[in-house]
């Protein structure tokens, strides 16, 4: 069936993703060319698990029980000049204020100026959606006219009716600032839909 072949092709495409580099300084970034899709979300929102599920790899992005463990921009190369970028979780780990300020300045500058950035995937725990930093990420995308797609992760933690109601509420509140879907790394709900968005942005 054509539809099944299409989904399989998308899975294979993202499953080629491999670790490229981690950067905590501008000079460590790859050349600002090609196409990059960033993944952002609160600590413990399930961002690393979502990346792993979408790429059909268990250990591509490291998951941690410690909030804010990802402290750098982590680049995964899907194809030459086609990257998935894992941003530090907001609500950073307990670190010195000067280090936290450095991260914030670095990430803010990257979001505002990176020309290769073509889309932002914003990962939110469905039980705690649209917190302050989630809205700030949507504002970054909207200010740059970048598409934003929201994953309401851990959808399996709510009943079907409650999950559907949350989806409708978030969709209403976001308005034109982004699209939104249900997602679960555990049950695989929404993985094909999320892959389709990302592969389209990367022009794969």
Model-predicted segments: where are they?
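Glycine-rich, phosphate-binding/catalytic loops in enzymes
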Residues: 56-57, 100-103, 137-140, 166-169, ...
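Canonical P-loop GTPase G-domain recognition
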Residues: 14-26, 157-204
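Switch II of P-loop NTPase G domains
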Residues: 29, 67-74, 88-118, 126-140
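Conserved G1/Walker A P-loop phosphate-binding module
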Residues: 6-94
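Residue-level signal for inorganic ion chemistry
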Residues: 76, 153, 194
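Conserved nucleotide-binding/hydrolysis micro-motifs of P-loop NTPases
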Residues: 24, 69, 82, 89-92, ...
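Conserved C-terminal guanine-recognition region of P-loop GTPase G domains, centered on the G4
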Residues: 108-178
């Amino acid at each position: 069936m054509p539809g099944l072949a299409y989904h399989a092709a998308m899975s294979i495409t993202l499953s080629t993703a491999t670790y490229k580099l981690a950067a905590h300084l501008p000079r460590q970034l790859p050349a600002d060319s090609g196409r990059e899709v960033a993944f952002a979300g609160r600590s413990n929102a399930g961002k690393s698990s979502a990346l792993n599920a979408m790429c059909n790899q268990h250990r591509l992005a490291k998951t941690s029980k410690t909030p804010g463990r990802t402290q750098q921009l982590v680049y995964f190369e899907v194809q030459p000049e086609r990257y998935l970028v894992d941003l530090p979780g907001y609500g950073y780990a307990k670190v010195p204020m000067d280090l936290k300020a450095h991260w914030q300045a670095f990430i803010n500058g990257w979001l505002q100026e990176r020309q290769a950035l073509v889309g932002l995937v914003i990962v939110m725990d469905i039980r705690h959606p649209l917190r302050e930093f989630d809205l700030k990420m949507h504002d970054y995308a909207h200010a740059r006219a970048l598409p934003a797609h929201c994953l309401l992760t851990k959808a399996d933690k709510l009943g079907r009716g409650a999950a559907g109601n949350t989806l409708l509420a978030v969709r209403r509140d976001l308005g034109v600032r982004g699209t939104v879907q249900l997602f679960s790394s555990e049950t695989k709900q929404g993985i094909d839909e999320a892959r389709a968005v990302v592969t389209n942005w990367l022009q794969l």
